[in-house]
Design a protein with these regions (language model features):
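N-terminal phosphate-binding loop and flanking beta/alpha elements of the actin-like ATPase fold
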Residues: 5
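Asp-based, Mg2+/Mn2+-dependent phosphohydrolase catalytic module
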Residues: 2, 12-34, 39-227
Length: 227
């Protein structure tokens, strides 16, 4: 109603883009074309001619396949064989010793290690569970290789957001989120303002560099629209 475009920028690489559109639509938020995922950022580092080992969920698998690259899903193709140009990692519940071993072999063979995000945990109604970043960290430890991280708060995700907002000055953008270590850092990567929502993840605004601090998303909107 205010004439402001809203992008939903998420480190969720597990759900497909359509699933994320549907989830937002179910709560009355039409968002088709306005969702940016860490899976989308991960594939910006992939070439269509590559052979890619995917250690991730269906959202990441879908995005890798869409590039045209030969896509091998690590837990669907055992035993994994041959060489790879990249290993792309995201949250998935199938992670086990064999996935770690296959990723190790591929990376040691020269594959580029790409992490969709470095979030250590993933929120659920029953509390946090290990996130995609924990899986990336395990593969980094095993291989001795530092992954290229593409999601928030890193540069590839920022580049993707800029591409989706042609003609928009970053000085006019506001990153809204509840974590300074990802959302605030992403705002700094983009070079835009940061609005911190005190949702419980960050209980107060102390020691956080934010342009706006509010107890809720509605509070952020009110401050942004108040002259």
């Amino acid at each position: 109603q205010a004439g402001v475009r809203v992008l939903f920028v998420t480190n969720n690489s597990f759900s497909t883009l359509d699933e994320q559109h549907q989830a937002l639509g179910a709560i009355g938020v039409p968002a088709t074309g306005d969702v940016v995922t860490s899976a989308m950022s991960a594939v910006t580092a992939i070439k269509p001619s590559w052979r890619v080992l995917v250690c991730g969920g269906r959202g990441l698998i879908e995005e890798v396949r869409a590039t045209g690259a030969e896509t091998v899903v690590v837990y669907e193709n055992r035993p994994v064989s041959g060489s790879f140009d990249a290993v792309v990692v995201g949250f998935h519940r199938e992670f086990d010793f064999q996935v770690l071993a296959d990723a190790l072999t591929a990376v040691r063979g020269g594959a580029l290690l790409i992490g969709s995000n470095y979030d250590p945990t993933y929120p659920t109604p029953d509390g946090p569970i290990p996130g995609g970043g924990s899986i990336v960290a395990a593969i980094e430890k095993a291989t001795g290789v530092t992954a290229l991280i593409t999601g928030k708060p890193c540069g590839p995700m920022a580049s993707l957001v800029r591409e989706m907002c042609p003609g928009v000055d970053v000085a006019d953008m506001v990153m809204v989120g509840d974590r300074d270590d990802t959302d605030g850092a992403f705002a700094r990567t983009l070079g835009c303002r940061f609005a911190l929502v005190l949702s419980g993840v960050t209980p107060d605004g102390n020691d956080v560099t934010a342009d706006i601090v509010a107890p809720s998303l509605a509070g952020v909107v009110q401050q942004l629209l108040t002259p």
